[in-house]
């Protein structure tokens, strides 16, 4: 009987580890804020800024309305500053002028976390330009700064939006887009099977045993 309670306790611990979101972030330069250009049909300004991130990463991006590029620094501190510049010609087509390069290693997918190609996404009843595109499975706030399919954020996103997801990060001027990932689909199915096994084990552990009576 004690063995069943031990198994149940282990199952609860594993379930909490699977479902609780992770607070570790190794991709600090992409957490919450973005310095890439942003434009939409109602946009009238562009943003450019400088990043100070870890020595392992550097980032530079061009403003959508000017040729000036943001400065990068190898300072060990993690900070961000944004300067707003008025745009002379801001429209939905201004994002075509934006350009960006990525170098360094903020995750295990070195050189693949950022795409300079600007894509369009329909968010909040309008089309917006997405300059930050994270490849399938990448999560800035996930475990190891890489694939966080077992954290609540990416797990729910990949389950509810299997073909990709675009959203506006809190405090950020730009939009972030996650692409579809067959690997994420497979991992999500495996995670669902594991959760189902844990639930069945909990039900069996706490279920009252049946008693049989024989008459002689």
Curated annotation (Swiss-Prot):
Source organism superkingdom: Bacteria
Tagged with keyword Transmembrane: yes
Topology within the bilayer: Multi-pass membrane protein
Main location: membrane
Claim: Zinc is one of the keywords in the record: no
Composition-biased stretches (Low complexity): 28-67, 89-108
Membrane-traversing stretches: 5-25, 137-157, 183-203
Region (Disordered): 28-115
GO cellular component, one term: plasma membrane
Compartments it resides in: Cell membrane
Keywords assigned: Cell membrane, Membrane, Transmembrane, Transmembrane helix
Protein name: Uncharacterized protein YxcE
């Amino acid at each position: 009987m004690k063995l069943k309670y031990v198994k149940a306790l282990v199952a609860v611990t594993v379930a909490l580890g699977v479902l609780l979101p992770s607070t570790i972030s190794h991709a600090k330069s992409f957490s919450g804020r973005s310095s890439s250009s942003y434009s939409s049909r109602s946009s009238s300004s562009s943003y450019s800024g400088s990043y100070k991130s870890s020595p392992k990463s550097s980032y530079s991006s061009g403003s959508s309305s000017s040729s000036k590029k943001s400065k990068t620094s190898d300072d060990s501190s993690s900070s961000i500053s944004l300067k707003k510049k008025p745009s002379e010609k801001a429209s939905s087509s201004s994002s075509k002028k934006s350009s960006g390069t990525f170098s360094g290693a903020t995750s295990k997918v070195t050189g693949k976390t950022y795409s300079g190609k600007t894509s369009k996404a329909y968010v909040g009843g309008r089309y917006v330009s997405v300059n930050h595109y994270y490849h399938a499975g990448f999560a800035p706030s996930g475990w190891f700064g890489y694939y966080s399919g077992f954290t609540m954020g990416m797990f729910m996103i990949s389950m509810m939006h299997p073909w990709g997801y675009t959203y506006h990060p809190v405090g950020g001027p730009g939009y972030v887009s996650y692409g579809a990932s067959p690997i994420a689909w497979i991992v999500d199915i495996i995670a669902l099977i594991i959760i189902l096994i844990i639930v069945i084990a909990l039900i069996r552990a706490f279920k009252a045993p049946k008693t049989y009576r024989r008459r002689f």
